[in-house]
Amino acid sequence: MVQSSVLGFPRIGGQRELKKITEAYWSGKATVEELLAKGKELREHNWKLQQKAGVDIIPSNDFSYYDQVLDLSLLFNAIPERYTKFDLAPIDVLFAMGRGLQKKATETQAAVDVTALEMVKWFDSNYHYVRPTFSHSTEFKLNTAAGIKPVDEFNEAKALGVQTRPVILGPVSYLYLGKADKDSLDLEPISLLPKILPVYKELLQKLKEAGAEQVQIDEPVLVLDLPEAVQSKFKEAYDALVGADVPELILTTYFGDVRPNLKAIENLPVAGFHFDFVRVPEQLDEVASILKDGQTLSAGVVDGRNIWKTDFAKASAVVQKAIEKVGKDKVVVATSSSLLHTPVDLESETKLDAVIKDWFSFATQKLDEVVVIAKNVSGEDVSKQLEANAASIKARSESSITNDPKVQERLTTINEALATRKAAFPERLTEQKAKYNLPLFPTTTIGSFPQTKDIRINRNKFAKGQITAEEYEAFINKEIETVVRFQEEIGLDVLVHGEPERNDMVQYFGEQLNGFAFTTNGWVQSYGSRYVRPPIIVGDVSRPKAMTVKESVYAQSITSKPMKGMLTGPVTILRWSFPRDDVSGKIQALQLGLALRDEVNDLEGAGITVIQVDEPAIREGLPLRAGKERSDYLNWAAQSFRVATSGVENSTQIHSHFCYSDLDPNHIKALDADVVSIEFSKKDDPNYIQEFSEYPNHIGLGLFDIHSPRIPSKQEFVSRIEEILKVYPASKFWVNPDCGLKTRGWPEVKESLTNMVEAAKEFRAKY
């Protein structure tokens, strides 16, 4: 009998219960006991759901109140000293590391003011992890102040009658994905391996004592280009960890091709391996060849990253091939990765078109898929499920919903001229200086302003038909005016309208484009309590009418200052949607580029001549390995942006924005935007600024962290700008936050932006 396995399940709850209780706790409206009780309830639901579905190997320790990598940092005492000074409870230390903390002094507690650790993309997904941060003084040990999470949750499931397989990020990946703290920049995190291995060993021993038979130990860095010095660390690590006193270890990889690093793991004494055969089915032969007698092969054939139904025939064929290689008793049918990246349950979608809905599979449905495939390759009768699945796959492939001949014809018109501005940047800059007459250190924001409760209530009322379109438009215009007047009052130079009409920077556009489908409850965790509801690209994309012109024109009409039109770029819309799996990413991005070109041209025609096209996801789409696939991606990603933005006059200023990523200036240069803004506030490495010293166009390196409620002082802004100006010329530098202000409250936004503008004014006086 071939077993079924799931690598992880969404932690957020079917109705976003985790977000609600976490934010209630942060705001003082829920106790820590209520927070912990809700977490326990969510874990129990997930375990019971998987047990009921018939999944054989059920994960534990896949739950987190914020981020699973951050959990490990807390557990292993990798806590920078600045978070240990305030006598905080363990859960509050966790949240302070994840989002920063600023509290006024009370009679019983000193004031707290700490910034968050850096948050970066989890490989090429839209999930973000909190980056482990190490120093020479880091002392690894099991931090048992709040228990031992992997052991406690294993025992919790065991008490419910559910035998689970704990999930832990492996030591090589944990260190390699971390960074040196600002006081230890000469430290190579991987050099800490000998210090951390005894702590891993102790944790594994405690899991064995609790009754764990296997542990899923994730080493996803194996899909990256690893230096030989890092490759050699796997043998060192697993020779030290494996033994009779610890559970069996299943070394787990996902998101890519392991073959270039195969030598690093071919002789490891682990009980088995997991590989992603959704992303790289062609690696099966080579990875199977390294298995020794007794080692199992976990075959990731159900996509943990997308929402399309698994083709049972194709997936079963892959598993059957694995069985032929290593034997039926040594193969496990599994999800390709954790299901963290998919919505919880398709059954909660009551408004989806029935035809389209039949093409989808969310996390709950994927449980059934791994079970059916396992039964099928084991010889059990699942003919009804196979027939229904085949019919669904066939219907989608033949549907007219996916094909628009006009869009396909327009794609053929794209050439280099269409994707090139009328003049090079120096000539454009001359015209833009004459037109806008901006001061040195021009100030702006990235786009969104706080999405208040009042905004959400009125948007909901409009969606339900409780207020008219005229009433809703009047409300939105009032919100826009509030944002504009505030920006004028504090002296910002280039304004935004605040985006009160937008629910999400991708969904808002997807809802107005042909070729998209939408969910009502298809939430996925992006980071912490930030969840997104990605649109689904189901067919060829086009723009039937203008999407943003009305609000931008109104905003410009009430101010004499330049007003930015705000759009989300083609690659970001693609990356932050669930994409089609039947056509290439390049085709989808270029279709989006053409649709956005129409919008950019309409904005310019309506008098909006500063236009920002955000591409925060362009880095995350970069293939994980160097080579032709990566260079091809960079070419079509930049081309799709230029297709969108190259139809304007020289005097129209094109901006773009990037966040959550380590960026190569050459990637940005290829976009040929006039001004770019980049998340920067949590970058501690001075070399990162140096990389942009030769960037030819204008740039704004983000000066404060919008993911944290913490308010930076004017002096903090001044110090940050001084550091940047040691490397980057004042004549090209813009002053702005890291990202949009949607998730922040008005009081912190007002104070932070006021301090930022005052700092810019101080530098104008100096220069």
UniProtKB/Swiss-Prot annotation:
L-methionine binds at residues 446-448, 499, 614. Pathway: Amino-acid biosynthesis; L-methionine biosynthesis via de novo pathway; L-methionine from L-homocysteine (MetE route): step 1/1. Changing residue 104 to Y/A/T: No effect on catalytic activity. L-homocysteine binds at residues 446-448, 499, 614. Its EC number is 2.1.1.14. GO terms for cellular component: cell surface; fungal biofilm matrix; fungal-type cell wall; hyphal cell wall; nucleus. Changing residue 121 to A: Less than 5% of the catalytic activity of the wild-type. GO terms for biological process: 'de novo' L-methionine biosynthetic process; cellular response to heat; L-methionine biosynthetic process from L-homoserine via O-acetyl-L-homoserine; methionine biosynthetic process; methionine metabolic process; methylation; symbiont-mediated perturbation of host immune response. Its cofactor is Zn(2+). Binds 1 zinc ion per subunit. Changing residue 456 to A: 38% of the catalytic activity of the wild-type. It catalyses: 5-methyltetrahydropteroyltri-L-glutamate + L-homocysteine = tetrahydropteroyltri-L-glutamate + L-methionine. Belongs to the vitamin-B12 independent methionine synthase family. Catalyzes the transfer of a methyl group from 5-methyltetrahydrofolate to homocysteine resulting in methionine formation. This is 5-methyltetrahydropteroyltriglutamate--homocysteine methyltransferase. It comes from Candida albicans (strain SC5314 / ATCC MYA-2876) (Yeast). The gene is MET6.
